[in-house]
Design a protein with these regions (language model features):
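Subset-of-secretome marker
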Residues: 26-281
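Repetitive helical segments and hydrophobic/amphipathic motifs
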Residues: 12-13
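C-terminal motif of bacterial Sec signal peptides marking the signal peptidase cleavage site
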Residues: 17-23
């Protein structure tokens, strides 16, 4: 029975992953701290913060720093599985946390190529950096944002700006996030259907809603360049799994869960040609 429960839990977590498509040290003396002079004043108020974010983030694709992209966070929570008559399968739900590490570690390699990437200074960022395929990275307005907060570090060398999107719909999220490719999603679903054939089947997404979308942007104050930006999304996904063959006794289980994941981009604004010239001198 444990194997059957593990198989169902594994499927829940795998479906979540495949259906989803985020510094300077203060110089000190014995008597005083050294602070960095900022290029611009700290923005005050939500509208000013959103405009500030748009200004610095849209400059990334124009100025083309070296970029390193990687997955920053991943989690499955609020799993609810039960029978069609509404009876909860609490044993299945409680087994999910113990299987997360196993499932995530086992699928890590499959995601490395699509989720991890690195570019050199001057490379075109149109495809890699949000919003993929566009010349811009954000078209958010103050009306799109639930909350905005900004804070400088101790020596004022960097500011961390956090934006939480208001009631995130697909159309709204597309104004600042990468949503992924329908072709990639279809290919992933097809692969897992074939692997699980005869044991388990699952429906396509019956519903997918964004419950929270957040952007955390770290900005270098001396020149208003982006040091890093993280895009974090939480999606509530509903699907149905059905046991087949030796797992037929599981029956049909409607399942819903929240899947949180983040992509983070780190920037290096060093121009190699400038560095080479300086060394030659």
């Amino acid at each position: 029975m444990k194997k059957k429960i593990y198989a169902v839990c594994a499927l829940v977590l795998v479906v979540a992953m495949f259906f989803s498509f985020a510094a300077c040290d203060a110089g000190t003396t014995d008597t005083e701290e050294t602070t960095v002079a900022a290029m611009s004043e700290m923005p005050v108020g939500k509208e000013a913060m959103v405009n500030y974010y748009n200004s610095v983030i849209n400059a990334v694709k124009v100025k083309k720093p070296a970029v390193k992209k990687f997955q920053s966070t991943e989690n499955v929570s609020n799993v609810i599985c039960g029978t069609e008559d509404g009876e909860r399968n609490t044993l299945l739900e409680k087994s999910v946390p113990t299987l997360k590490k196993f499932i995530f570690d086992g699928t890590k390699k499959a995601f490395e190529e699509s989720r991890n990437a690195e570019t050199k200074y001057g490379d075109d960022l149109t495809a890699l950096f949000p919003v993929s395929g566009e010349s811009w990275s954000s078209r958010l307005t103050a009306a799109d944002v639930e909350s905005a907060e900004i804070e400088a570090n101790d020596d004022n060398s960097q500011r961390t700006l956090t934006l939480v999107i208001k009631e995130p719909s697909v159309d709204l999220v597309k104004k600042a996030f990468n949503l992924g490719s329908e072709e990639d999603r279809a290919a992933a679903v097809k692969e897992f259907r074939e692997k699980l054939k005869g044991y388990l089947s699952f429906t396509d997404i019956e519903s997918l809603t964004y419950t929270e979308c957040k952007i955390i942007c770290v900005i270098n104050t001396k020149d208003n360049t982006v040091a890093s930006v993280e895009y974090i999304r939480t999606e509530k996904i509903t699907t149905t799994i059905t046991g087949e063959g030796t797992l037929a006794e599981i029956g049909t289980l409607p399942c819903s869960f929240e899947y949180t994941y983040g992509d983070k981009y780190e920037m290096d604004w060093t121009d190699p040609s400038t560095t080479t010239t300086a060394e030659a001198d």
